[in-house]
């Protein structure tokens, strides 16, 4: 299920900070990202640059502290959002396809996933349930990762999003001043 993103305080907050978040992501080279660890679920090159996790047991948590030093403004923005569990940049290189899957097995059963487009192209998109969407720079998509979804970048430029997992109960919470 896709959620109507603009109504939530954290979405307005993230979108207001789009320029500095995009600028920090743009400083990263493809080599700075790690391959998404579950390699049997995709073809092509899906990479992640994790910089925040509240759960040290999460399989990407070890990379967060050193990575956070490379994106201090983005980390500061994300840390102010109530209910954030983890965050990072997700990179799909051209020709990448992520097969249909559900995220519940990855420990996000009670979380929603937010993607804020940073760089994309018209041939990059995602299907959640029966709805297909594409990423627009500076705009957020929120979806329930427990619902079947898939993604692809069939274009000729990389797709980069800020990926934030947030507790469902915190969606309406205002950002502290």
Give the residues covered by each predicted segment:
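Acidic/histidine-enriched, beta-strand-rich ligand/metal-binding domains
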Residues: 132-136, 147-168, 176
